[in-house]
């Protein structure tokens, strides 16, 4: 289940799938991939996931 705060910035080409929680004022930048298909992923408030990162 995705739980993404409404203040999260999702850049073009980013992908968020599966069991993912993303906190307030977080940036998910260009072509970053966050996959929570094998377990829960938690990204806290005011975090920054840079271009092309894979989590």
Please state what every model-predicted region is.
Residues 2, 6-10, 14, 20, ...:
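A structural motif detector for beta-strand N-caps
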